[in-house]
Amino acid sequence: MRRIAVIGSGIAGLMTAHDLLKHGYDVTLYSDRSPEDWLNKSRPTGIAARFESSLAYERELGLAHWDKDFPPIEGVYLIFSMQPTIPFIILAGRLSENGAAIDVRLQSYRWMNDLVERGGKLRIENIDIPRLDTISAENDLTIVAAGKAEIANLFERNEARSVYTKPQRKLAMVVVKNTGKFEKIPYNPVKFNFIGDHGEAFWIPYYHKSVGMTWNLLFEAKADGKMDKFTNAKSGDEVLVIAKNVIKELFPWDYDWFKNAELADENGWLTGALTPIVRNPVGKLPSGRIVTGVGDTLTTLDPIAGQGANNVYRMAKNLVQNIVKHGNGTFDAAWMSNTFEEYYEKSGKATIDFTNLLLEPITDAGRQLLIAQYGSNGVSCSGQQVIANAFSDNFADPTFLTSYFTDSAKVRAFISEKTGRHWLPHTAGSLLSVVRDQVRQKIGMTPGAGYW
């Protein structure tokens, strides 16, 4: 039986370890914290939103312990504003299949215990480079799934694929209970607020480790904009107060929903920034031995597109499939590189491109797509609704529509196909509706599109 070590007990490490165990490998998982530490002492690692392909992978491995409990993510409700307090474009899109966001602290606690019960080995210790070298000597393959920890620097930055050299947003996240409900929206959405020069904010239905149904709020502030107020926050209470003020100032349509919100738990918050990066998949140790990586260790994404967890699932599944296919072969540098390239071509590039597109000013093609769907309501069968649903489904599978966002010809053909009309008169009619709703707001009325 081939021995494989996995370093890290987040989603990437645990999904990889469980899949390997299912395929009969001798698996040892190394974690810097115990299951109880994950559950009771840790911060959330992010929004942890995942879509149907990821949830199906959990079911395949017998890890879907919360399928009947979590609040479903049924679609996207997006408000795009050029300036604070004034909606410009509204999109109400439904997902083809529901997604979910589940507290990683609860998952890691349960999945680590599951691993031991199923015959895997668990070691609780901090792993540095010398210790990693020793572990590598004891195993046929060692996989680093340590997220953005210092050990990830063992893997060199891929300059050609890493677009950014510094963080693109200042981030703040808080998990809250005691919110209102979006009763007028006829489905349970991820609610997006995009606002010109200031940043983006997302409200995600979230299954919390002890409270159950909560909301996970993510703020993506552009430096020096009106959302950029979280940097000096020292506690979840401070983040919550700032969040209420930001929502009241920038997104007043959501203030009544949020004004009575409370922290779900004292550790349920984060602030910081990260630099998106793609790393090479071969890490060379001082002894000359090599290890590979999975998840954020190799591809760190800004959370703006909600692709972090989904990217991890795709990469882990591809990695295990290639391990199994490799049989008794040597896990050399060529195998590691080829395995990563297969993931990158199948889904990684599209996922990274989609995420980076949302960090940049909207493209002409993207603008045409948003205008063409204007009037979507989440329930109709109109051409606008079909386009809005397609936009939403790209979060579930970025290979679906990402290439269209930089190709106006493809977008125009897509609009014509989905609406049954030539793209030009359809888009012109939608643009007229946008202008009409701007006039309505100037005279004190709400937009005709959307739910208010």
Model feature map: region roles:
Residues 305, 321-452:
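C-terminal helical "tail/cap" subdomain of flavin- and related membrane-associated enzymes
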Residues 33-81:
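N-terminal FAD cofactor-binding segment of flavoenzymes
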Residues 7-9, 21-42:
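Glycine-rich FAD pyrophosphate-binding loop
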Residues 274-352:
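Conserved mid-domain beta->alpha element of the FAD-binding
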Residues 195-271:
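Conserved FAD/dinucleotide-binding core of flavoprotein oxidoreductases
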Residues 156-191:
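Central beta-strand plus flanking loop segment that forms part of the substrate or channel wall
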Residues 1-12:
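Beta1/beta-strand and adjacent pyrophosphate-binding region of the FAD-binding site
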Residues 59-60, 67-156:
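Conserved N-terminal helical subregion
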